[in-house]
Structure formats: C-alpha cells, structure tokens
C-alpha cells in the first residue's frame, strides 16, 4: 500500500504498520484519537513545507514594502503603457482611476520581479501564473457555462478585480506585514497583472463593444 493510499483512510489504523501491537489497544487508541493524530501530523507536515518553501507572494510584498515609489523618473512616466484600451474593453469603471494611477509603477515592479528572481526569492512567471489562476477561478464563478462570457465579464469587471484583490489579501491576512504595506503591495501586483493581461480579457482587434 502506498502512502497516498494510506492517506485516503479516515483513520490511522493502517498508517503505522510498525506500531500495530501498541495501537491494538482499542480503549486507548479510538478512531477519534487516530483522526486527531492524523490531523496533527498533516498540520505539522504542511507547516514544515511552508517553512522550506516560503510564499512568493509574501516575498514580493516584503520587497515592495522596502521599495521607494517617490522617485519615478519623468522618462518612466512618459514611456508607461496606457491601459485605457483594455480598461474600456472590459468596461472597468470604479477601478479605472486606481489602475491609471498605479500604472506608472509597472517599470519598478518589473525590475523588482527580475531582482527577486535573480535572488531566488520568486519565479516571476509562476507568481503571475498564480494570479492568473485566481482570476480564472473567480471569472468562472461569474461566467459559469454562459456562451456570452465576455458580456458577463464586462458587467462584473470591477467586482472581479475586487475579488482578486480580496483573495490576494486573504493569503496575506496572517502575515506580520503592516496593513498599509499589504494593501499597497497587492494593488501594485494587481495592476501589473492587469497590464500583463493576467487579469480580465485582452482586447481583440475589430471586436466592438
């Protein structure tokens, strides 16, 4: 029996073949006690895994919290991508100004991603892929099996953006970061992902609203 097969059982009776003589005492080792034992074991295993593999999202927020955003060069402001076409294509309204305001920082965020990747703190494409997967799941909860998915996305684009923000925020809820650093960091990641077309839909030429 493999470890995966053993893990599928509701208790630990078959999980400890080397300790069967001890655990044969049904008065001491009840089904509930085995379940508690299994739960503690799994929690410890997850905790160790997280310690070995810290969250790329947390590493990014930590780096952003130490980033100076006051020294944006005029050349950076002039060369920044204008997301107006995509904002209009997706009918973004309440988050329109936020994205326009934060777009100027994309160059700094991209450089930060590259630096963190060189340090081995994150893998940029994996981080962005995770954000895209969050978007895909949230989009699915709105679109369901509709054949007119784009129209539904347009009707709910601001709610979808807010839901992605909330999910990223939720993943950092138990961290030691300041509230302000989490909000700023998640907004920067969100806007960068929007510009990279990891969130909401990429405009298609000749597709009129």
Regions found by a protein language model. Name each.
Residues 33-80:
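Glycine- and acidic-residue-rich phosphate-binding/metal-coordinating active-site segment common to enzymes
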Residues 18:
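Short, cysteine/histidine-rich loop/knuckle motifs that typically chelate Zn2+
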Residues 9, 29, 34, 50, ...:
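Phenylalanine-focused residue identity feature
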């Amino acid at each position: 029996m493999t470890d995966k097969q053993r893990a599928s059982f509701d208790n630990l009776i078959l999980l400890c073949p080397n300790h069967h003589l001890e655990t044969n005492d049904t008065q001491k080792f009840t089904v509930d006690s085995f379940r508690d034992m299994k739960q503690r074991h799994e929690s410890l295993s997850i905790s160790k895994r997280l310690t070995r593999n810290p969250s790329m999202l947390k590493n990014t927020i930590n780096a952003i919290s130490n980033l100076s955003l006051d020294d944006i060069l005029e050349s950076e402001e002039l060369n920044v991508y204008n997301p107006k076409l995509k904002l209009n294509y997706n009918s973004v309204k309440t988050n329109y100004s936020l994205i326009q305001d934060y777009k100027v920082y994309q160059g700094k965020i991209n450089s930060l991603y590259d630096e963190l990747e060189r340090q081995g703190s994150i893998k940029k494409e994996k981080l962005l892929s995770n954000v895209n997967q969050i978007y895909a799941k949230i989009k699915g909860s709105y679109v369901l099996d509709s054949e007119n998915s784009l129209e539904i996305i347009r009707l709910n684009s601001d709610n979808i953006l807010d839901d992605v923000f909330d999910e990223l925020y939720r993943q950092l809820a138990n961290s030691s970061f300041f509230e302000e650093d989490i909000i700023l960091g998640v907004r920067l990641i969100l806007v960068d992902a929007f510009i990279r077309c990891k969130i909401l839909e990429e405009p298609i030429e000749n597709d009129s609203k």
